[in-house]
Amino acid sequence: MGVPFVLMIHKFFPMANAFFTSLGFNVVLTDPTSEETIRLSQQLAQSETCYPVKLIYGHMQQLIDQKVDYIFLPTIHTMKHEKSRVKHNYGCVYMQTAAASIAKALDIESKGITLLSPVFDLDFGQEAMASAMLGLSKILGIPKPFCAKALLSGAMAVRRHTAAVEKQGKALLATLRPDDKVLVLITRNYGVSDPILNMGIPELLLERGYKVITLSHLPGHALDISDEYAISI
């Protein structure tokens, strides 16, 4: 089971890894973006997109070269924002189309590779996401009860990962002195953990003496600050 280390995989990999491993698959995650990934992406890209999406070409080609049987890359239709006042929070058009369009551009079917791209409507909650993942049972030829059990393993993996990340954040905050300066990096997960997309900013800040933490390390996701950032229409 090939998994390109791109976009929201930086968030969903703990779930996906536990899910597919529980079903007996060997999970192959591509290496972090490198100069080779960039070179492949520049050669293979067939349209102008944002840089994070363009890098999918290189990551997917690396999985093709490794001769995986499946490539897992979800389609993100809507996002979940706890305090949003709009009816639906849609992902950008590339998140909705990149998996299928790039798989087609690289013609993975002719190479014997099947794309698994469940549609995640995250603003409908965990049940909708679970339904999308269970829909893979037919493609994989695995009974739904087995997939449901694997999905529970995925959910537990997410809880453990989230707790571990927040524990790291609390440990850092506990070491702070009153005059310490801490910078919180607020971006998508891939904007922090991808070594190319983060442009070395975390390391640069550390070199300048700042303590750096990401939004995922902070347990304040339920805090409602919408009144401070509401847009008047």
Identify the residue ranges that each predicted region occupies:
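An N-terminal assembly and electron-transfer interface module characteristic of large anaerobic redox
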Residues: 1-233
